[in-house]
Amino acid sequence: MKKKIVAIIGRPNVGKSSLFNRIIKEKKSIVDNKPGVTRDRIYSNAEWLTREFILVDTGGISIDQQLFSNEIQIQTQIAIEQADVIIFVVDFLNRLDKDDKMIAKILHKSKKPVILAINKYDKKTIDDHNYEFMNLGFSDLYFISSTHGIGIGDLLDKVISYISKNDVDLKDDSTKIAIIGRPNVGKSSLVNSLVNENRMIVSEIEGTTLDAVDISFSYNKNKYTVIDTAGIRKKSKLGQTVEKYSYLRSLSAITNSDIVLLMIDATKPITDQDTNIGGLIYDEKKPVIIVVNKWDLVKNKQEQILKKEEEIRAYFKYISYAKIIFISALDKTRVTKILDLVADIKQSLSVKVKTYVLNEVLNKAQLINPAPEFNGNRLKIYYASQVQAYIPTFVLFCNHPNYLHFSYKRFLENQIRFSFGFDSIPINLIFRERK
């Protein structure tokens, strides 16, 4: 089922980030220090009463005080476009100001569910200006304290009620493909080439935003849906705000896809924006194909192809399993080869490993390369089995997971990956203590 987006919006210093951290139950730093990945942390997967959703913290946006009102308005408009449910946060301890009222006015014009969260409420304060908040005109109104946890459960119950109300279960057996990349790498050209090449468009499904369209088509008797084909249109007046929110659009597409196509421009160096997008794919553990577009514009192709591959591998070490393909979306060169790779990946995802064969591979791996001592002891794996999941997932029962060094985990991943043909997809190893 598609994950819905819940956006927390409001002016600075009303407690958006505190509410974000309270809901996801842990503190997130602004910079996420993963190997090769550094990015603004304005989103997280969240869960309440077994329902999962994507939570967005707009507090990650820095605002130039001279452009304060303009930036607030832009922030609000983008949140409306992206979100399925909006939590509008105001400050109980301070009177409403013009920016609160401006946000409220914009939200009333939208068709999105809005929940008013009146933060910094401690139950002891005299409620002498509650009428101010009621005058904002929102029927869903909750007094909360993100610091002390007051009212958070009731707030999330309301969020989930809107998410559940909007759920529609449609039987769809097509493979969902997200085409992701920074502006002007040729995403739209690739979509057009895929669709026009096959000339078998099944449907165009309007998305939740004005400019998002999912396109379905068939190729070699397989059904495909390219999801979230429209990106946020880059407008100079939006500047960095749009760049940050483009990650939200990308995250939504990645989360709800089966396979991701990460597009880069063959004529330009790889940028932080490229690797940031790669980081989203890594976080979501999605199969990915790196599509190098505009290869027709490159001179000395035979000489340059190895250099480009080396550059890509160096920048995207954390998704080393990704296949790389060089194409020209405009000329339709090798475009259908992408779908052949997608079909191969789908086949790999369906492989089920027999338990006894898996344990033979792991026993052999431990013989040829015993686990190093770590945290005062040595890891010992007793047995393992594959469990049901979209990507190949294996539970390894051991003496204690704390004895696992990350380098040895990578070694075991590689042993499983190449023993069972998982070389082009992510796999997941879960270590559990044997009771």
Curated annotation (Swiss-Prot):
Q: Name one GO molecular function term.
A: ATP hydrolysis activity
CDD domains registered for this protein in UniProt: EngA1, EngA2
| Stretches assigned to the KH-like domain | 351-435
InterPro entries cross-referenced by the UniProt entry: AAA+_ATPase (IPR003593), G_ENGA (IPR031166), GTP-bd (IPR006073), GTPase_Der (IPR016484), KH_dom-like (IPR032859), KH_dom-like_a/b (IPR015946), P-loop_NTPase (IPR027417), Small_GTP-bd (IPR005225)
SMART domains in UniProt: AAA
The Swiss-Prot or TrEMBL record describes its family as follows:
Belongs to the TRAFAC class TrmE-Era-EngA-EngB-Septin-like GTPase superfamily. EngA (Der) GTPase family.
The UniProt function text for this chain reads: GTPase that plays an essential role in the late steps of ribosome biogenesis.
Subunit description: Associates with the 50S ribosomal subunit.
Name recorded for this polypeptide: GTPase Der
